[in-house]
Curated annotation (Swiss-Prot):
Top-level taxon: Eukaryota
Organism of this sequence: Phleum pratense
Protein name: Profilin-6
Keywords: Actin-binding, Allergen, Cytoplasm, Cytoskeleton, Disulfide bond, Phosphoprotein
Main subcellular localisation: cytoplasm
Assembly and oligomerization: Occurs in many kinds of cells as a complex with monomeric actin in a 1:1 ratio.
Amino acid sequence: MSWQTYVDEHLMCEIEGHHLASAAILGHDGTVWAQSADFPQFKPEEITGIMKDFDEPGHLAPTGMFVAAAKYMVIQGEPGAVIRGKKGAGGITIKKTGQALVVGIYDEPMTPGQCNMVVERLGDYLLKQGL
């Protein structure tokens, strides 16, 4: 299965009538493996900050997490595994696997829980596949 298929069928899928605003699978260096049409372009320093937060949980909490210059308030996640952010009525979930970052960005009416479920389910699957 191609990386694009994972994005199209597993991240951009419909959940209770809603779907993510955008999604992507990136390498740990920020290289885009696959993305939805509206996925924002990460800046290298944003990826560096995200990876540092996975290595040092809480690193982004004081400053917030920036994605394509949009600032997200970092909220409860799973140290070393999941970073969650909130911005207005929407937010972001990033799941780290052995080789990839699975990213989902949502807006209302999708809920944070729905975004978490979609992103983390694919991330957990990729981890089980050794990816």
